[in-house]
């Protein structure tokens, strides 16, 4: 069973991501967090196999959270799931150890990205010219 931590300040988005992920019989959301600080606590307590992480949260942004998690647990793949996806954000995400990024609204890419990261890959979609 793959244990996944879902981090988003919006409870509706956390519910949506949980429902999406748990359609796979081998994926289980082991914990949820609504802030960056909660995410750090949940990682230490639950030791997930993977993390889905929002970019914009009330206390710390996803880049700062990922930087801290990656320094402590570099083996845990992090997928940034955001509505703020841009080429610049994706490049910054790579630099801090995030292994993938996709739009919250793209159900297909979320599942595809999780699959890629679980198989030691990365997932950064090609950005359109408007986002460069």
How would you label these PLM feature ranges?
Residues 35-38, 61-64:
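Acidic catalytic/metal-coordinating carboxylates
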Residues 75-86:
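A short, hydrophobic beta-strand element within the central beta-sheet of small alpha/beta folds
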Residues 63-74:
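Short amphipathic alpha-helix used as the core "switch/output" element in two-component signaling
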Residues 58:
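The feature encodes the CheY-like receiver
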Residues 64, 85-102, 108-112:
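Alpha4 helix (beta4-alpha4-beta5 surface) of REC/receiver domains from two-component response regulators
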Residues 46-52:
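Active-site beta3 strand of CheY-like receiver
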Residues 1-13, 17-21:
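Conserved acidic segment of CheY-like receiver
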Residues 8, 54, 82:
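Active-site residues of response regulator receiver
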């Amino acid at each position: 069973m793959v244990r996944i931590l879902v981090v988003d300040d919006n409870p509706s988005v956390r519910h949506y991501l949980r429902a999406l992920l748990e359609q796979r019989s081998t994926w289980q959301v082991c914990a949820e967090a609504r802030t960056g600080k909660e995410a750090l606590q949940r990682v230490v307590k639950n030791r997930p196999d993977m993390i889905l992480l929002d970019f914009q949260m009330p206390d710390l942004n996803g880049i700062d959270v990922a930087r801290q998690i990656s320094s402590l647990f570099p083996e845990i793949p992090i997928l940034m799931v955001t509505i703020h996806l841009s080429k610049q954000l994706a490049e910054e995400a790579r630099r801090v150890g995030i292994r993938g990024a996709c739009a919250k609204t793209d159900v297909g890419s979320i599942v595809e990205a999780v699959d890629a990261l679980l198989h030691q890959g990365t997932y950064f979609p090609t950005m359109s010219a408007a986002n460069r």
